[in-house]
Amino acid sequence: MNFTPKQIVTELDKYIVGQANAKKAVAVALRNRYRRSKLPVEVRDEITPKNIIMSGPTGVGKTEIARRLAKLVGAPFVKVEATKYTEVGYVGRDVESMIRDLVEVSVRMVKDRKKKEVENRVMPIVEEKLVEALYQNRRVVEVDVDRNKLLQDLRDKKCEEETVEVTVLDNPKPIMALGNGEINLGSMFDGLTPPRHKKKKMTVKHAREALLQEESDKIIDMDNVNEEAISLAEEQGIIFIDEIDKIIGKSKATSSADVSREGVQRDILPIVEGSTVPTKYGNVKTDFILFVAAGAFHVANMEDMIPELQGRFPIRVQLDSLTKEDFKKILTTPKNAVTLQYSNLLRVDNINLVFMDDALDEIADMAERQNRDDEDLGARRLHTIMESLLEDVSFNATGEHPLLDVVIDRKYVQNVFKNKAKLIANTKPKFGFTV
């Protein structure tokens, strides 16, 4: 999809409050990818992505911006934590595993797309097998079973939860060998033994999915899938490296820990600069993958990164701590607004939450104060507050009553939290519904 930077920011605004500078930076980076794709090959190969590094406290939207961006354009995306990697030669994950993870995501994306493309071709085969399974079920209790009616019921999804016995491919879990090589012994011996089938009992819904997968795999060219997946990862892949500040030592390495952190930085450097990483699907060039790094940078500074790595993240963005106004917007404005999430959950049990405006002010004020006075958790602070605020409502709701309105106003919030600055877990008001 060819979104303009303004359109990208507009889409991000639907889910993320504030952080205009970060949204603008990623929007421009994404649009530049599209611009690059329209250039002649000889020019295109000279233009590499401008990687981004974000600085800001936890919970202010760093990860969500990158994730929503990838979802918006259908790009393969992985989030990794810098602290999980160790220097080459030590036990732990090597940095190249982030590229292998990205390719795995890309393969799944391409395979899912191919599966949808061939679904109409394989569906008659799947339906035939399911009708036969349903026929065997029904003939036990019915003398005259109409296969055409079974097929229609199947297409109308009238028997989704009925249990049937079908013969499907037996897929044992692959054996994983941990270590720097991360060898998957299961995939290593793929194709050396004939596929095994076994009869399994499952619902029609799950049987359809299993049979669709099996029949699709028979006609999907996996060599073609792998080629497309590698190209997709190379040209559109996005890797989000979180907690990058945790692998940054102080200005001068003074301990073995600082030296080790610098070693991880130097291992990451060729990946970000552009190198070729071998995977089980083929070699992957990292030159045009977009890297987005992020960290709180409470102790270390961006300037403490090794200079070579600093140079590979030319776009630097500072994300702001959330204000009371931001918290109030998070409660009500986004498509996935916090109050809407809890309202949808409790409506299952016939509870209609009604949040008054003064209650939203109170909750937002509490979130801002607690983040300022204690640890800054960003938007995650709201979930802590909301869980405690609605604990009694959630506990007492059974769904065995007509739809009830529960009004949440300032007084209700203050009764639950007698001190705005601290959550007191053992001080809960007597629960009651306001109809």
Where are these regions (language model features)?
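Non-catalytic accessory segments flanking P-loop/AAA+ NTPase cores
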Residues: M1-V435
